[in-house]
C-alpha cells in the first residue's frame, strides 16, 4: 500500500497525488491537518517536518518526491512497467 501524508494547501502534495493517480496507483491520503496522529506519524517516518511523505510497501519512504522519482520507485517495485 502506498500512503501519502500531507495537507490540502501543499503544492508538492498535490503533485504527488496527481502523479500516483496518473500512474493508476491506489494510495491512502493522510491529511496532517485533519487526521488525528497523521502529522506525528509523518514526522516519525521521516524525522523531519517536510511534506509530502510518501511510503511504499517495501517499508521505504520519500519526502517531497518529484513525479519522476515516484515513477522510478514504482518501476523498481514492479508496480509500473
Question: Could you describe each region identified by the protein language model?
Answer:
Residues 1-23:
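Local sequence-structure signature of Cys/Sec-based thiol-disulfide redox active-site neighborhoods
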